[in-house]
Amino acid sequence: MGPPLSPRESARFVAENSRDVLVDHEGVRRAAELLLPAAAAWRVEQWKSLHELNPRGADEAALGWVFLVDSLNFSFWAEREDSKCAVRYGGTPYTGYWALCAAVNRALDQGIPITSASYYATVSLEQVRDIFRSDTAVPMPLMEERHRILNETGKILLEKFGGSFLNCVQKSGRSAQKLMQLIVENFPSYRDEAEFEGKRIAFYKRAQILVADTWSVLEGKGDGCFEDISSITMFADYRLPQILVYLGALKYSDELLKKLLKGEMLLNGDKQEVEIRGCSIWCVELIRDRLLELLEKGENSPVEINSVLLDYHLWDYAREHREDMKGVPFHRTRCIYY
């Protein structure tokens, strides 16, 4: 079997051959119309102001923060909604992905050089447990895997890129696709691939979000001026499919819906899990295309809407509408890829 299809082609192939997940074209149209009023104002510069935990700089240190966080950006969902890992920082308790960011910032404030490759290449499991400790009785999931990835990733960054993710970014020649390939080729934990209907496919959720966050932290300038940023798709995790189902743009079969409502686990690489992720990516591509059509028809000046900005907005929308979405199940998969 040859190299995997790209995330976009993987998504198209999965959507065309999916049995339990369907992209609803009328729902896509309605979702685009719902998002339209906000879409014209989306800008890469908003990433830093989007959340108080994101780094404010656009330098090597900020890139080091982004690389560390995206290397650990997986599996934050709680077994029970009323019992979650939370990290208190600056007087505020954070859950999910933001608990990770809060723990990193807490460690940096305490003088622990957690974003330095020479530190996390040799950090012990005990130190990792302490750095990412929860302020509730519920620990952050997959702590052993996080420790292993920190050691592995740190060693590779030191050996191949002089300990700096900036060197990796500069090798990409300002290409989002080249940077994604460099990440996937050099760092094994980013190889988010599967087999589906006889083809090798790839979603590369963390590699793509690392490219997107690099673009965002550098505000699309200098080393982060990726002309091909629109080739990056949405990041196939467990929250985005939930919001797409809530918006009516994605539909599940009765069999799959029953399984998800019961809280049954789906293994990474299972056919239904692949269908959920692939169809979600394709759904967002279609919403983006529809948004661009609507914006072109409007009075607005041309706007660059890409799947990265759309993903950021949908993810925030999901957090804002968490209560409304309680009846929509998310798929439960424990893995290091998302």
From Swiss-Prot:
Main EC class the enzyme belongs to: hydrolase
Tissue: Highly expressed in liver.
This enzyme's EC code(s): 3.2.2.-
Keyword set, alphabetical order: Acetylation, Hydrolase
Modification N-acetylmethionine, positions: 1
Alphabetized GO MF terms: hydrolase activity
Record: residues binding queuine: 51, 235, 237, 311-312, 316
Function text: Catalyzes the hydrolysis of queuosine 5'-phosphate, releasing the nucleobase queuine (q). Is required for salvage of queuine from exogenous queuosine (Q) that is imported and then converted to queuosine 5'-phosphate intracellularly.
Family to which the UniProt record says this protein belongs: Belongs to the QNG1 protein family.
Protein name: Queuosine 5'-phosphate N-glycosylase/hydrolase
Organism: Mus musculus
